[in-house]
């Protein structure tokens, strides 16, 4: 079947990155997979790989699964102390959406694991996301975007 995509723009409206949403197979742990690369990059260098698991209206179950993933990653990144944050999601102006995030800051990128419980007005699926991001893409998101 056909893959979908989304364009990430900077604050000036310039297209910077493209996100490709991949089809998944039922046996995979992650229900949603996506890759991100720069617009017009002829080498298609991947700047992010994301996997998602849906937890509709179940923030506690999501946080329990997130805790398992974080423990697994702590066993991989033994010298990196993760940063944790919980609060309102910037993408929701109503303030109803919340997220619980853990970050592993690497020398050349970030691993970001988070649960989101979206407010009623937001048309997104609640759930867990695990994202491996290049430093370039991490900086773009911090500078230009609400994620």
How would you label these PLM feature ranges?
Residues 5-6, 48, 91, 125:
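A sequence-composition feature that detects small, non-aromatic residues
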Residues 1-15, 72, 80, 92-93:
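Non-catalytic effector/regulatory segments
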Residues 30-92:
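Long, charged/polar, surface-exposed segments that mediate recognition or autoinhibition
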Residues 3, 10-32, 96-147:
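An acidic-aromatic pocket/loop used at catalytic or ligand-binding sites
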């Amino acid at each position: 079947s056909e893959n979908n995509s989304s364009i990430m723009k900077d604050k000036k409206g310039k297209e910077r990155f493209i996100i490709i949403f991949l089809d998944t197979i039922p046996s995979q742990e992650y229900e949603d997979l996506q890759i991100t690369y720069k617009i017009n990059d002829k080498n298609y260098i991947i700047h992010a790989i994301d996997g998602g698991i849906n937890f509709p209206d179940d923030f506690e179950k999501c946080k329990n699964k997130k805790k398992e993933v974080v423990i697994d990653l702590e066993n991989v990144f033994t010298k990196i102390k993760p940063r944790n944050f919980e609060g309102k999601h910037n993408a929701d102006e109503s303030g109803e959406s919340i997220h619980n995030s853990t970050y592993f800051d690497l020398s050349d990128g970030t691993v970001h694991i988070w649960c989101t419980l979206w407010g009623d007005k937001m048309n997104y699926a609640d759930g867990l996301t695990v994202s491996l991001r290049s430093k370039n893409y991490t900086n773009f998101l911090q500078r230009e975007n609400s994620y």
